[in-house]
Each structure stands twice: as C-alpha cells, then as structure tokens.
C-alpha cells in the first residue's frame, strides 16, 4: 500500500472544508483553477441546477448483483418499476447505500434529493475521515452514478421483479451486496460532473492524439468510476485511478465537456539525477548523524522503488551522478587531462574555474531490479569524489625556463578541485542534457513505454544560482518538448518561495570591458561576484572612476548597463518541488505496519515545534549551550520594495567626486584582530574597549576634507544613539518611520536584543502601511555635502554606545526565514546563517581609494547585503572614506519595507539576497576585503505592486521572453493568492486537481508521471495576440483525387486529423475565457473539444498552443480549413546567441563501462527544428506530390527491425527435410504473404480489385543471394541498367489474352516450349553459395507464371498443385532432387528430354544490357532480372572493406543508381477497429543474404502506435516459428549514438596483438576461379566477430563501389562502419578504420524483453557438438517477441546454445547484463595475447570468408554442393578439379581435393540437405562454407 493514507487525509482536510460546503457557497479554489470557460461553468454553483424534477425524491429499492453470464451490462435499471418518478433514458441516477442515512445527521425523508441536504450529509459525515479505511464514506464520495438505459426485453420478461442490478465488479468497488437496500434518485449532470479524471496505463506507447480519441470515444458524456477498465479499439487499455469533484476524490462522476482527463504512465522512462554537491557529504547533525547521501540511498530511493513495486509500475531507470567541481586557478595551468582548452566555457563573472561531471550509474534498467540499481549506486559513490576531485597530470616533458625540455617525469594525480555548493551547481545543464534526446523522440520509438520523467535529487533547499542563458535555453527546451521536472530536496524547506532560480539578465549589447581580467584573474569568486554588482548599483557614479580608483590597474573600456548585473528571481512552472523528510515517512511507515507503539492518527495533539536555527556557521555551531542561550541573535526586517536606481531623495547624498580621491597604499592587517574575528558573533562587542573605534574603520588621510568626515560623525551620532534612547524611538508611532533616512551605514551597527525587535514588530505592524511613501528625515540632519537615495529601512536599536561595527565573517547568509504569508514571522531568536568554515583576517590597513559610504562594512553576506547608492551634486567637496576590516555581526531584516515612489523608466525593486545556503571558503586578502564591501550591494528582486503577478510590469525583453514560463517574483513576500493562482503552473495547469503543497513529496508524480494535459488555459489576451504575434495564414482542403492515398474525405475528418497531428507534436487545445474573447467573431462559445460533431460546423474555431507558437483552425465555407499560425515576436530574444544554431556545452562524461571521464562537447539545441505545418497539413489532406521524402521532412515516427537467423533445434530441422537456411527463407516468405494480404488498398480501389484477384502476386519479389549486397552490386555493376526501371516488373511474362492456356488442353512438350520461350519463365545460371546451377528457374516464378497464364488456375495453391503434377510427369526436376515442386526460392531444371538449347545464359539478376549478353565476367552469375532486396539494412557486408571491382571494367562511365529496398502501404488495422485508416509505410529488403539480417523499417505520421505494436508482435510470433528473431535496433549506427543520447557511448575494444597481414581473397566466375583481389584489412576482426556469434546487420557506405549510387526507399545510407549484431539482439558491433571494435548495447531489445516477465524460461537447445558455439553465446531474449507484451508467445524456442563455460540462457531478470557478459568475453579474449596468436594461426590455416554469413571460399565450382537453397553436399555432374588452392599461413598451401571432399561428405549428423557440413567454424558462421579445412 502507498504511504499516502494517513498523510493524505490531513492534506484532504485542509482542502475539503471549502469543497464540501454547500453548493451555494462561493466557488471552490480548485474549481476556479481548473474548470472551463465562463460560458461553460464547470461547477454547479455557476449553473442552473434543476432543483425539482417529477421524480427527484429518493426511492428505496432492492439491489441485485449479477455476473457476466446474466448480462454484460454493468448496470440494469428497470424503468417500469420507477414509472411514477418520470425517469427516462439518458437521465443520470445515483445509487446511495442505506447506511449513509444512518451515519448522517439528518434522517432520510422523501425529498432528500435537494442539494443542500445532500451536502449536509457530506458535512455531517466528514468525521468519517478519521477512519483509516473511510476515504469514500461520505455520500458525495461513495455514491454510484449511472446513465439510464432501456432494460433488455428478454431480461425484463425473465425477471419482472428486477429493479436494479449491478455487476460483481461494480458491487465490489462501491461495497454493494446482493439484495442490499439502496436509495435511488435523479441528479443533475452539473452537480455530479467531475473536474478531473486520472487515467493510468502501462506497457504501451500512447501518443496524446490517441488519448484525445480515447476520451471522445470511451469517456465523453459518460459515467466513469474508480477502477473502471477502458479498452479503446480493442487494443489500448487504461484504468481510471481517481475522480475529482470540487477537489474531493469520489468513486464515480460524470465526464462532462469541461472534465479534464489526466493521463499517467506506469511504464515511463525515468532519469534520476543526483546532485553530488558539497553538501552531499555534510553530516546531519540534528538527525541520525549520517551524511546526506545516506538519505538518498537508504531513504528516498528505497521508498520510491517500493512504491513502484506496490503499484506494479514498469519503468526504465537511468541514474546519473552529476556535480560541478571548482578548481584553484593554480591547477589549471598544469598539463593535465583537464587542460585549459577544455575549460574554455567555464569562466564567468560569478564563479571560479569549474568543470561539470556526469557519471552514468545505470542506463535504462528495469525498475524491478532496484536492488541492483542501489548496489551500483553505492559502488559508484565510494569513488565519485575521488574521481572528480583529482587531476591526472600528463607525462609529457615539461619545458624549462631556458627553453630546454626536461625528461618525461610521471607526476602523480593531485587533488585540484572540490564540488561546488548546490546553489551554484549545474542543475540546468543536467536537465537540458536529459531532455535533449526528446528532440529525436520520433526516431527509434520505444513502443512499450510512454513519457519521460526527470527527477533531480539535490542536497540543497531548492534555490539555484544560474545564468540567464542556461535558464532561457532549458526553459525553451522543456516547453517545446512538453516535459516537466520533479525536484526532490534533502534539506529542510526554506521560508521563502521555492523552487527559485536567481539569475542576472545579459547586457542589452555586447560589453567590451576588460572585466575579463576579473573573470580570469586570481580574484576570488566572491570578489568577482561583488565586482559584477558594483557599477549597476551606483548609477550616478562613474563606473570607470569607481572601479579604477577602488582597484588600481583595472579599467573599463565601456560602461556597463544598469540592468544586466542585478539579481532577478524566478519560479519556473515546469519544475515541481518536493522535500524529503525521513522522520515523517518513518512515522508513516510505522502506522501502515500497525506498530502498536505508533500514535493513532489525528488523536494525538501535535506538540508545538520549537524553532531550530539551521546554522552552518562554524563559530555559532561550536558555541556551548549556555553561550547560545545567552546570545541574542536578533533579526531585523528584510528590505523590500526599495529601488536602487532612483534619483536623489532627502537624506545623505555623496557625489562620485567625493569618492574619487586616491589614497595611500594599503598595508597588511595586524594579526591581533585575527583572534578577535571569531568573537564577532558573541554578545560582547569588543570594539567598545578600543580607544577610538572610529579609527579602525576610517583611517584618516591628509587629503580628506574635514567637512565630510564631521558631517558623517554627526550623522552617526543622530542615527546610532545609545540603546535606551533608540528603544524609545522604536516605540514611536509607525508613521514616523518613513521619514527616517534610508541610509544604512552598516559599519556602525551592533546587535539588538530579542526584546527590542519584538517591540519593533509590535509598533511596525500596527496600522495600515501605505504602498508608496516619501522618505523624509524624522530628526534634524546636518547639512549633507552630498545626497543619496533611500535604500534601507530604519536601523534597529543598538545595544551599546559604540558607533563602529566589527565585520561579520559570514560569506553567505540565507534569509530564508520568511514564509509565504505577508504577516511577519514571530521568530525572535535566531537566523539561518549558513556559512561553511568562513575565516577572516583582521587588519588595520586602510584602502587607498575613496569609496562610497556603503563600503564601510565588510559584511558581504550573499543573502542580506544592504546597499547604498550615492551621487554627488556639483560643487561637493571630495572626501576619501576609509574603512575598517572588522565590524560586528549585523542583524538581518525580514520585514517588508515600505515601497518608495519609483521614477519613470526605472523599475520598482526591493533588495534581496542570494539564497545561498553555503559558500566557498576564501581567504580575505586586500582585494577580497574590498570586494566584500562592494558585495554588500545586494541583489534586487523583480517586484511589482502585485508581487508574482503574471500581468505585472515586465522590465526588459529578456524578462518578457521568460515571463510565461519563469515567473519573476519576490520570493520573500509572495502573496498566497498568487501562489494559488492556477496559471502559475503554465502548461501543466490542468494536471493538478488540487493545488499541490510544496512541503510534501509528490508521490503521484514520482510513481506515474502525468502526460502533458490535452488542454490548457495559457493564452494571451486579444490585444497581445494582435500586437505581439506574427500571423501566417493558409488554407487546407481535402484532396478529392487521392489515387489510393489514405486521405480524409470530409472537412470534419480532416480537422480531427490536423488536431491529432498537433497533439502528437506537443500542442495543447486552448480553452478558457481568453479563447472565447479572441475567437468571438467565429464562435460565441468555447468549443467542446471532446465533441466531434461540434467541431465540424461552419465557423468552429480551435486554438492550439505550444510554447510561443499558437495555431488557429477555423472551419470556413467550401469544405476548407483556414489555419493561422501565431509566432511570438520575442522568441528570438529568449534564445541566446548560439554557435551554428545551438549551444556547445563542454562536460566530463563517464558512461557505464568507461573507466575514466572523457571531455565531450555536446550541442544543446533548445529550439526544435522548424516544422513545416503547411506541408504537414496538406500531406494529411492528401496533397503529397510535392514531398520527395516525407518521412524525414515531416518527422515521421520511425522504427527499424531486423530478422536475425537463429540456430534451430533438430526437431525443427527435420521438418520436411528442410535445412536451416531453407526454414529461414520459408519464414521470410511467410511474412511476405502476410504483408501482401494486408497491403493497404483504398476502399474505392477494392471494388475494382475484386474482379482481378487471380492477377495479384507477391509484390515483394525478394531476390535471395548468398553474397552481401555490396559484393552483388560490385559484381553486376557492368550489367546494371542505370535507372533500373525493370526492378518492379513481374518476373513472369504474360501471354496475350487470346493465348491463355488451359490445363486440359496442353501437352508437356508444348508447355516446355512455351516455358522456355520469350514469354516463359526466366532461365539462367544461378549460384548458391559455391555451386553454380546452369539453366534453372525458381519455384516462385513458375508459380506466378502458371497463375497468370492459365485460365483455369485462380490461386497460387492450385498453381503449386499443377506444378507438382508437371514435375511428377518429368517436365522438370529439383536441382538436388530433394524436393517436390514448391512456391519459393527453390531451384529447378528442365529435364534433358524437354530442354531447349539456349544460345546464352541469362545470369544477371539485374536487367541486362542487350549488348552484353555474353558470359558474365563476375562471380554473381546466378542473378536474374529479379529485384534487389536489401531494403532496410543499414550495412550487410562484414566481408571486404575495400570495394571489389568487377573483372571487366564497366563500359558505362555514368554513375549507376540502384534501389536496394522497397516500400509499401501496410494496413495495421485489418479488422477495422479504428474509425480511420491505420496505415504505415513498410520498407523491406529486396536483396537478401539468408545468413545476414533481413531489415524492416516502419514509418508513420498519424497512426495509432498500439496497433503497430500489435502488428509487429504478430510478425515476431510468426518469424520465431521459422527460427527468426525479430528485434528492434537503432536506425543510426552504433558509433553515432552519442549524438542523440549524451549518456551513452560505444565501448572500444583494442586487440592486444595486432593481426598479421590478411590473405588475399579469391573470386570465382564460370570461366576462372583464381582471380586475386585486394586483401581485407579487417579480415581477422570480422572472423573474431563471427567467432562470438555476430551476424551482419548493415554495410557501410564505403563498402559499395564509388561509381554506384546506392539508395534505399527510406533514404541514402550513411553508415561510416559496417555494423553487426549479436544473435541475441542485445549487442551491436562495428569495426573502425583502425581495426578497433566498437560495442554498444541494444537497449531497444532489452526493454521489450524486460517487459515480458511472464514469458517462461525456455529449455536450452539440443544440438550436436559440431553445432555448439565456440564462445559464450547469450540469448537473453530467448524466443521472446520484440514487444514485451505477453499477448502473443512464440510457438518454438530458438535459443542460442549454452556456452562452453556453461552459462545458461539469460532470462529477463538479468537481461540488462546480457550485453556486458558478451562484452566481457570479447574483452577478455582480445586482451589475451596467447589466445589471439592462436586465433590468427587458425584463421590463416583454415581460410574462410570473413563474412558474418556465407562467403565464397577458395574452392572450385565443381567442389561446391549444388543447392537449390543451401542443400546437402552431393555429387555433381561436373567433375572436380585435381587440386584446390588454399590459403595457408603464407597463402601458398594446397590441399588435395579428394581429402576436402571426404570432409564434405561427413555430414551424417545433419539432416539431409544441410547447407553446411562438418563442425561450424564458429557460432556466427551460420553456415559460411560447406567445408572445414584443417
């Protein structure tokens, strides 16, 4: 059970008070958030509810319970029994159990149907929530609803007393029992309409367009109930999980037009990011004492996995550890693996040199293996910190100062970095990386899992400091791809709004300043941070003078803009935050386990929690109990609403001139103050004991004008008076507060007591506070030599008379003491001072430069700096201001300060701080002291008069661009109503039935992520749409002349298809008030998006939105649809400038099997490729002539499959005496017949095809060859017709209609003449493996010829029967005399008595050039005009990398073009379960080598994915009966995987011993068999792959001749290396140009195998020893279908044999490890020099083709078995030659042929007709050769 039980109830009680009130009360919060537009109100309060019906009163009746044998109807209702009530068909009736009447406060009466009484029941029964099992005990929640239907007449006749009956499943859900007494009454649809319905599904891929169709078909205007099973089109299955009415969970509800469906996937892909920041190794001092990582590994993750297991979820899990490491500048210069070049993108104004690290722990592992996942995580955690903190120094010679090079010196690795804090981590980059593969979501579509969820686990508190560019890029990417993030924080929740991103806007124009010196120099991060905030916070001060005078040697070439360096705060709508509290869930777990000592829920009064200060400052943590009790750490109020860029205001004003005088050089600080620094946080202010504390702060200079100093002294005396006087001032009325000067000279502050701040709050909270105030002095102020803006509230009372202050040592203080309420918190004692081991150095040095008054304090807290901005009127004398290095701790203000009037063109802001919880330990040097003072100019909030309001004023184009997705707020004073605003959640608004609570873990989202809702209310106003968007209109109309295309025929169907297409691409249907206003001219009301009829009327308007793009579809007259695209003008502002359209991100990545981190440059493209919607809409409408490759142009969904030949069991091999190859080909032939049978034919064409049924033939026309496609193309290049127009023609030549034959009137001799004539069957010399068969034909062609040329033969079966009779009469015979006549790739020869002498042999499978009909010059002499068949394969040649040229040069100098695959339209819905055509493009090979993979590719645009999955599942089941395994593989090659999936990379294996020179291959043709070719440079690598049971998948482009343009129906092949696949389908391999082997796990097959948990383990295959694999052979997906749906199970089990080591076949439990097991065997073999040497010798002594598949060996034609398909080795009519050339170690050894032939005959253990004899060369050989030499 979920832990939600006891915790949820308290959550429910918080929300249910309003929602269970009378329906006449104000609209509930939830309804106002999520319900539909104003014209269609979704709550009963806004509708006209029928309060009186003729039959509204409740009626008592007896309920029956029936099963499916009684009736399939869920509810049977006899209207005759209730005739007096006026109930009619279509009314909604509720069934209420009688027990509710006894529990309620009112007794049942005849008129209990009124809503007020019904709700009184709800309220009176609210106490039932106390029961742990009473979730649905109120009548509102537990009632059963149904729509009245007429009772079937037969049931009414047989059971006249039946009043009401429900099925057993309904009775179980609602607690009904047979013969129960229930009460029935009519209810209004408005009163029982559900606001949200949660729908869950698993083990299937469902696109959002299918969800929309499911709702329209199965849910709209119907009653839904919890646990209801939904079946759509007999294939898509889903379950109703929850139903909400006005925020309450109920058992049943009415699905109204305004109900929002929320789909959740229980088989999703989860990417878990664990931020390994510095805090992850911090100890939990207040809890168990463990480090925070223990909370992850022992708390959160086990809880998450248990909840997955309890809900039977089947997710795929990827876990990545990530962190950002900060380096010392001194380590960057050393020669290391992290060179300065690789650190080029990590310098910025706020950070030290950093590098981002990613460690992939597991990738796409099934969630059921959670123990393995945790073990891997623990293992990687042990070494993670060591790996990322050390730099390995290169062994390269180090250049000396004199230029000479020293000898190589191996230097050890050094610890050069440390992880950054969570605040400054690389969280946005990690999220962007995880979502980057979604840009290719349409390629290699996983048909089992739906949805991707990213969970980020951070030790922080939900505050992150990011760059604007990263925030904008990530926001755009997530918005475009429709994905949301779950953030789980391990630290306690702060008291401000979260999640929070703080960022600085980029400059309006490129800056050319020399600020890079600060960025790249030796300054500390804190100093650079302060530098960045200097100039913009002194707008009236010359930036040049300020920087140059304060820091000599640093100049600015150009002025900084005012805006860019100010902090802004935003909350993204795509981030859902949770806080993990182990104590809470530990208590909940005790309750669920019925612990007798656990407290009873809701019966124990909770003790008031004492505020515990979350302090990380070392000095405070080390204080004793008495010290901390006696200390008064007082908290002044936060400043808010103050603008730092306004003009002068009454009070202090200093001119820039007064701060520009140069000073003396500074000296070192004296050491005696260093010891006093740690005392700065103790109660006694030690500066009181100094003789003249002012001298510590202001060191006098001779050039300092006395007027300024004296004025400041007088001002200090007035402002910082002794404590009693100041306290008295605090008691003055609040109205005096605005008149006090808003200048905070923090150098003179001291502590105030808790009592004083309490008094302060009492007075300040009394009376209303004006929103706008004018600041004036409240006491006489001396004549100011300068003026300054008011920038801070009144200072708290001082505890002593000291006018100086010791600087605080804190580097970063979080002021997260403020909740979301506008009422100031009453905490008195402590603040959160989060500083890690902050140190300070005391000194009496003075700064030589004049500074602002603000610089008097060294308090540089990143959280609570107060800033003063100064300006100088003309004529003000200059006075250098000198500073001390030490001031006492200054209290923190957390009360909202009064807002000041803002000037025009200046934003209204308040001061804020960085929400840092920790900070880097940095020594205080001369420069850092200055930086610390300047850092006091704290960040500013993006605040308006309505904080957090979306409609608030936007201050810059950058903020405006981010505004819809990242809301700029004041995190410390965000009104509750703003957080409750449903528009806060953006595109995910409709996924929340109730406003989520931040403090709890969102288990629902973590267990089953919600898919992007179908609807949204995010929409601009009419004015914004007209002024801020660019419009692009066009019109679409259905194509009346589609010519066989499955195009819609009506406007309504076209509109639905266009909406479906947009939904599948991430668009949402817009509903709400704004849409009604905008579309007023076309429609008077918001359309019912689930009503198909309403969408078809003239003028119907539908708006869809996705990010910044909006589409409007209008049904106009003339059967047309007008489409208007709206594109936001600021889209270009949101995206930063990119290189080649994307951002290049450099990071150190370590994938699963990689031993070290490798630097990778990753292109992060946030913008999706511009989709041509005009083309797409017209393509849907049937206009398709203008697209040359629609699959790529319109981003079709694409998947690729391969049929892998498996080793067969003996009982299958003995079937009809067919050998393994023949059985495989039979399987492909069987599949082709299925494809032909379900080929899509438009309805109008079917009428014409019915009369021509006998004319149809198998259009696939696959040509089978025993050579790889590249070899066939190279051999036949001189005979290929350039355009190859005859490939699609029928191999049989039709006779004229008048010459058609009849079986009864034909003789054998005449038939023999016709068959061998010009209009007969093609006769040619055909080669199969190494034997050439002369003048033969194949059975498939003769079958087709007979079918088309005989009037009385109508089916292929009749043709086969007739052909068998001809064969029995001796017209022809099988070349091996083994088979009777068959329809397939079987070779037959005309008998000698009927054979006609032929002048030539037609032996090319390509259309022959008539001038070249002589003897073929290449070995492919067994080809015909038949079409080539390598359709979908990417690369099928393992053979020879160098291209083999034909014997005779080609006479054609033009580049030949050949198509190696063909496509067809395939109907995946032959049973017509869908209301539309369900068609896919099926691409298949036309040239196939039986020992290689047969390739298929499916592409579709708007087809139901579940139907495609079911279709492929049936193919897999059929193929496995014939020893073929259907496996999904990636479309791209293995070496390119990291371009689309950044967390994956092929594993490179190098041979420890370089292979020797490969032997030269020998080619054969009918004339010569001794022609030598170029040696294959990868001969031994291919043999090695064959040894480890790999077969060829796809050939590289370079394997084909350079003068041949090879293309496929799906596009041009682009493989760099040839690719091979393991027979298990779990591992891909490629051989690089250097001879290395790249290995990559095929996770597409593993996901499907893992889902087939219920498929039993299969017995191992019983094979003779000579068929055993030599190396470890794993078949983890043993006889499992490529889809993991258990619907269809294979009939036969074609498993790989056990390895010699005895490893059993892998089941689904360890399927994830299958690729690693195979890889480990290969690595071990390649690392063993002795085994490699032995392998090289054996390969040379036993020459065989290096193909993964059959290859021509060094044999004569006469010594090769004559096979129709691969057949037994038998004698041939051609005598063997005397000797056989063989490649020995030196390529010169010859072996007598008689010995070889004796080995060939040694096949007694094999079935007759085996294609190969003797032991296999390897498990991969798949019968590569008939002989085994040596």
UniProtKB/Swiss-Prot annotation:
Residues 30-47 have a biased composition (Basic and acidic residues). Residues 1317-1392 form the DEP domain. It comes from the Eukaryota. Residues 1-12, 726-736 have a biased composition (Basic residues). GO terms for biological process: intracellular signal transduction; negative regulation of TORC1 signaling; positive regulation of autophagy. GO terms for cellular component: GATOR1 complex; vacuolar membrane. GO terms for molecular function: GTPase activator activity. Keywords: Membrane, Vacuole. Residues 646-665, 784-805, 849-863, 1440-1450, 1815-1830 have a biased composition (Low complexity). Residues 16-29, 668-679, 907-920 have a biased composition (Polar residues). Belongs to the IML1 family. This is Vacuolar membrane-associated protein iml1. It comes from Aspergillus terreus (strain NIH 2624 / FGSC A1156). The lineage of its organism: Eukaryota, Fungi, Dikarya, Ascomycota, Pezizomycotina. The gene is iml1.
